[in-house]
């Protein structure tokens, strides 16, 4: 056991950790990455040891400010370190790595130890990787979904009809929710939309909405806002909804993987936690997104519907075209700007964005009884064209703590580079993967001002020297890096009518 004095360090390592001077570790049974229990007079917390020569002095232990909510302690107070017990779930993770089926107790233990931070990021990564490689059956996924939901707050509603739209993502510029949610809310449908931040895309719905208003809302705030406006657009992590899911997402993000068992559990756990009874799941299909073809999409849709039946949630899935970005704007600020422009003037908005937003809203207008079967999309258009959706969107922004903005008031990256067409021809391909990578290289989603604005879409004719797209960034260095990447990966491809001249064989 070690007795050391606490020193607060403003550092976030993404996991529970303690920092110890290497001199204090010499001659002991404690080594870097050992799991230890740090105890004070008022509680305890588990962390992994990181050693240092200079960050803390001999006799001190560095306590991360990001973890202090777990333990009541004063700086300089003496604490004791001792070895923590090995997590119970380690053998269960190994079992899944071997491709075996986990029982309910094993799944619940893994999720519980994720939330209690007994698992290191390395151990959690092993679990995520094992489900990515070996998958899970529907009973495992159902159990994992329920336990993820149970680890956080559960919101209940007075109304019995509470609906939601969710996209599994993967499509750059997928800002449909900023149109669909206010359309539904304007029709009197209760739609408490909670979203994650970006995992594999350059901007999640929460990242885009955060450009315009506060998205970190507590349960009481969500209830108040929804009671006033019928809807909200909030970040799920701010409400303590399914906290295990957010911890898992933070491990998935660096390697841009989203294992299907986690995808299913993540989506449906949030529906349980927010009291959703009806949901439409958008499954984009195409090159460069999570689902490559319609057969894969139909298979995933069946799993969502089956999981919904197991959880008593009515699920309807739609396969949507995901072969190129939705609309022309990619990146938080650019997407927020395009969404407002589309709400203000839908007739001149990108057709792909309008069609998708109306289609998804229309289904729930029908399920919610606001429209007859087959008439939902028409009603959605009437609400959008009349300006009622814009009015409702602005009301939601205000209730969440923001101020409605005009499109031109949204600040974009001050460092800008236009990419020009090298030849006369037609846009033959826009790579979702390349677009995503370039926008991330420019700084998104952390840099809200970073992104790409497309001037043309697939099939459009261009002339040599025309602007194909514009890259924005809040950093000159990040812009240069993004431009260099764009010149290597060609996010937008232009080809002439003459593909190849062949004179000999």
UniProtKB/Swiss-Prot annotation:
Residue ranges annotated as coiled coil are none
In terms of superkingdom, the source organism counts as: Archaea
BP GO terms, sorted: AMP catabolic process; pyrimidine deoxyribonucleoside metabolic process; pyrimidine nucleobase metabolic process
Q: Which InterPro entries match?
A: AMP_phosphorylase (IPR017713), Glycosyl_Trfase_fam3 (IPR000312), Glycosyl_Trfase_fam3_N_dom (IPR017459), Glycosyl_Trfase_fam3_N_dom_sf (IPR036320), Nuc_phospho_transferase (IPR035902), PYNP-like_C_sf (IPR036566), PYNP_C (IPR013102), Pyrmidine_PPase_CS (IPR017872)
Q: Which reaction does it catalyse?
A: AMP + phosphate = alpha-D-ribose 1,5-bisphosphate + adenine; CMP + phosphate = cytosine + alpha-D-ribose 1,5-bisphosphate; UMP + phosphate = alpha-D-ribose 1,5-bisphosphate + uracil
Keywords assigned: Glycosyltransferase, Transferase
Active-site residues annotated for this sequence: 258
GO cellular component entries: cytosol
As one GO molecular function, the record gives: AMP binding
**Residue sites binding AMP per the record:** 170, 196-201, 205, 266, 290
PROSITE patterns (alphabetical): THYMID_PHOSPHORYLASE
The EC number(s) attached to this protein equal 2.4.2.57
Q: What family is reported?
A: Belongs to the thymidine/pyrimidine-nucleoside phosphorylase family. Type 2 subfamily.
Q: What function does this protein fulfil?
A: Catalyzes the conversion of AMP and phosphate to adenine and ribose 1,5-bisphosphate (R15P). Exhibits phosphorylase activity toward CMP and UMP in addition to AMP. Functions in an archaeal AMP degradation pathway, together with R15P isomerase and RubisCO.
In its UniProt entry, what is this protein called? AMP phosphorylase
Organism name: Methanococcus maripaludis (strain C7 / ATCC BAA-1331)
């Amino acid at each position: 056991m070690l007795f050391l004095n606490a020193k607060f360090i403003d550092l976030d390592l993404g996991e529970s950790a303690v920092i110890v001077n290497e001199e204090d570790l010499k001659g002991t049974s404690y080594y870097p990455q050992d799991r230890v229990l740090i105890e004070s007079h008022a509680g305890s917390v588990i962390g992994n040891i990181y050693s240092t020569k200079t960050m803390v002095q001999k006799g001190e232990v560095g306590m991360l400010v990001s973890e202090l909510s777990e333990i009541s302690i004063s700086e300089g107070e003496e604490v004791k370190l001792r070895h923590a017990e090995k997590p119970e779930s380690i053998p269960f993770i190994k079992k899944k790595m071997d491709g075996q089926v986990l029982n309910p107790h094993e799944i619940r233990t893994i999720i519980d130890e994720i939330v209690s931070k007994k698992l290191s990021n390395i151990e959690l990564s092993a679990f995520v990787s094992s489900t990515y490689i070996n998958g899970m059956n529907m009973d495992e996924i159902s159990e994992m979904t329920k336990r993820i939901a149970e680890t956080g707050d559960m919101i209940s509603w007075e109304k019995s009809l509470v609906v939601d739209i969710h996209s599994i993502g993967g499509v750059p510029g997928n800002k449909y929710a900023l149109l669909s949610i206010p359309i539904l809310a304007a029709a009197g449908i209760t739609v408490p939309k909670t979203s994650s931040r970006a995992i594999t895309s350059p901007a999640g719905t929460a990242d885009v909405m955060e450009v315009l208003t506060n998205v970190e809302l507590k349960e009481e705030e969500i209830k108040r806002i929804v009671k006033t406006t019928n809807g909200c657009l909030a970040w799920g992590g701010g409400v303590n909804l399914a906290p295990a899911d957010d911890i898992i997402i933070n491990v998935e993000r660096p390697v841009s993987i989203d294992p299907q068992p986690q995808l299913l559990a993540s989506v449906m756990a949030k529906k349980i936690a927010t009291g959703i009874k009806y949901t439409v799941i958008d499954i984009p299909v195409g090159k460069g997104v999570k689902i490559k073809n319609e057969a894969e999409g139909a298979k995933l849709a069946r799993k969502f519907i089956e999981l919904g039946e197991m959880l008593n949630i009515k699920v309807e899935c739609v396969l949507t075209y995901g072969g190129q970005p939705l609309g022309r704007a990619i990146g938080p600020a650019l997407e927020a700007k395009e969404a407002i422009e589309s709400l203000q003037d839908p007739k001149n908005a990108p057709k792909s964005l309008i069609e998708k937003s109306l289609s998804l809203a229309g289904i729930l207008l029908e399920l919610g009884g606001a429209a007859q079967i087959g008439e939902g999309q028409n009603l959605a258009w009437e609400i959008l064209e009349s300006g009622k959706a814009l009015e409702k969107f602005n009301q939601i922004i205000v209730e969440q703590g923001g101020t409605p903005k005009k499109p031109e008031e949204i600040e974009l990256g001050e460092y800008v580079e236009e990419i020009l067409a090298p030849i006369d021809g037609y846009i033959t391909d826009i790579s979702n993967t390349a677009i995503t990578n370039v926008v991330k290289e420019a700084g998104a989603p952390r840099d809200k001002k970073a992104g790409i604005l497309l001037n043309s879409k697939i099939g459009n004719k261009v002339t040599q020297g025309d602007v194909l797209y514009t890259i924005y960034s809040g950093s000159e260095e990040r812009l240069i890096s993004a431009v260099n990447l764009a010149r290597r990966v060609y996010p937008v491809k232009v080809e002439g009518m003459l593909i190849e001249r062949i004179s000999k064989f």
